[in-house]
Amino acid sequence: NTDTNCCFTIAQRAAQAIDEFPVLVLPPIWTGYSPHHMPHPGSITLKYHTFVELLTQVAVSVHAHGFKKILFLNGHAGNSPVIAAMRTKLAAEEGFSSLGYNYWDLPSVAEEIKKVSVSAKGFIGHSGEIETSLQLYLQPELVLMDVATWVPGVWGNPSTGNPEKGERII
């Protein structure tokens, strides 16, 4: 749940910091577009158009209840093109716009990643230094550092992760 957990925590913390208007943080959509991960056991993916439609219907529902500023905060790079397509679809077919960001591209998060990164050089990676650091801070019981190695499917060096880096990023 690394992608979901990191993204959801950042969304919740950001919402708590906003006083100017009400902010609704929906429960995360835990699956997305990941056909490139299917060779790795345990991966689950939606079809491209299924995921576009799921996101579209969530946005349409939220918009119907009066929320006019809709932000999709993403925690998985593979979802980025799908979110872009959904945003285009919303504008063309539903007549309203939304925003979509990867949490690691938010200015304060990106800046902190660059500062703390040893092996990743500011790159979020996949189960590498940054995601390992975030999980060590958020859910340390799920991280087994004694087996954290650079293996196929991992982009970045997880052994350089630590909870202090994760806390700074969050």
Model-derived segments and their meaning:
Residues 1-71, 75-170:
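Extended, histidine- and acidic-residue-enriched regions that form the cofactor-binding/catalytic faces
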